[in-house]
Every structure is written in structure tokens, then in C-alpha cells.
Amino acid sequence: MVDGMSDMGTTELGAASTPEQARAAFRDGLVRPTCGIAQGYAQANLMILPKEQAFDFLLFAQRNHKPCPLLEVMEPGVTAPVTAPGADIRTDVPLYRVWKRGELVAEVPDIREYWRSDLVTFVIGCSFTFEFPLMEAGVPVRHITAGRNVPMYDTSIECRSAGAFHSTMVVSMRGIPSTQVADACRISGYYPSVHGAPVCVGDPSAIGIDDIMHPDYGDAPVLEPGDVPVFWACGVTPQAAVMASKPEFAITHAPGHMFITSKRDLEYMV
């Protein structure tokens, strides 16, 4: 499980920070989750694979748009994403995960030593993008106000397989006051490129979650009296696919430690 956000108070990064400031801080070695940073800009998950396995994953993402909404697919060996001019995909994420044959072998803040000319990067939308619009509408996002990472869970929801890749869906959860659940569904639904509307509202057991207080990734949830658990498809699903499908080599972001793009969130609003 990824560590929580105990160091969030040690940095000046916050809602008013620019994507460039955040990426520079991560490039310099700052490690912390990215929720609550760079208001108004889209955040993204990463999946990096050898070219020989990239088509299968591209097909997997297209068949499973809800958890894997593609914002950009980079050419083999390219490290400068179109979604963030001036960025380096190898250094500008606070924490990466390195996988070999489905096993996690390292968590590092810089992947230059692992980089290869055949690696293809997939930039995948993240629900952190619509958290600021939720808060602007008066819907509380409790893990941000508590200084925690968002809780994420493995589920029983089957993804559609593609080539070598198969998985169940991973979801993120936010406790929403019962009177504001409809607002949360409506607002997040405006952002289909960053997971869109929830996949489940209410009973966690309906999607195979036994105990919401013990997430598989991220931090334990913050739930207030009257809150309803609301679950969104999550871009950690590709990591579940890596563990299930066991590709020879892969690199991902660490859950909650996203790539902050230079794209405005409004560009992904419908």
C-alpha cells in the first residue's frame, strides 16, 4: 500500500501552484500525493510498456474507457508529452512503480535508469481533475481537507480483456453527503475523459468490496455522519492489469502520485 500524505504540510505546493511549479518540485525529488495541487488543471495516470505490448494495452484501454480514458499516447522512446510542454515523463511524477512480470520491484521518484528506447507511454485521465469542480460547487472532498490520499479498492467488476491484458476494475471512493450525491454524479459526469460519473453509489458489497475502511491503495477514507460512499472508476486499473497479466516490463505512477498536465480541466468537460 502506498504511504499516505503525512508530508503534505512540508511543502508549499497547493491549489494555487502551477503545473510547472509542481513538476519542477517533483523533478527535484519531492515525493507526495498530488490531490489538492494545481487547481484547474488535469491530472493523469501513467502506464509505460514496451512497444511490443503497447497495442494490446491500447485495445484494453479502448475497450475499458471508464477506468482507462486515454488523454495521450506517446511514440516509443519519447519523453516529452504533448499534454505538458517542457515536461519529462521520466522525472516529473512524484513516485513511480517499476514492474517485472507482474511483480512490483521498485518504487522510485525518477525512472531515467529504467528508461528504454522502445517504451510507449500512455497518459490516462484521473478523477483528481474533477475534485476542484466538486469543491467549487460546495461538495466536500474529505480526503483533501484531511490531508490524505484518496482510498482505492479492487472490485469484482470485470474489465473487457484485450490481447494479453485482463483485469478487474479498481475504483476510488469519496464519502459524499446524501443530499449532495446527485450533484457529485452530475458534476463528475461532465468529465468523461477523467472517469466521468460514478460506477456505484452506496453498498460497497455490490462491487465486491468487503471493508471500505481498509482500502487496497491509498489511505483510509474519511466518512462523516450522513455520508454515502460513492465509487468512481480509477486509473489504478492498469496496475491491476499488470499484476494479473504479468507483462515482461512496465512502469506506472504510484497510486495517488499523478502526472500533472498543463491542460485545463475545462478542456475535458462536455
Curated annotation (Swiss-Prot):
Q: Which GO terms describe its molecular function?
A: lyase activity
A Pfam family in this protein? D-Glu_cyclase
Q: Tell me if Lyase is a UniProt keyword of this record.
A: yes
Coiled-coil features, chain-numbered ranges:
none
Keywords noted in UniProt: Lyase
Q: Is-annotated flag, keyword Lyase?
A: yes
- The highest taxon in the source lineage is Bacteria
Q: Give the protein family.
A: Belongs to the D-glutamate cyclase family.
Q: Specify the protein name.
A: Putative hydro-lyase BAD_0077
Source organism of this protein record: Bifidobacterium adolescentis (strain ATCC 15703 / DSM 20083 / NCTC 11814 / E194a)
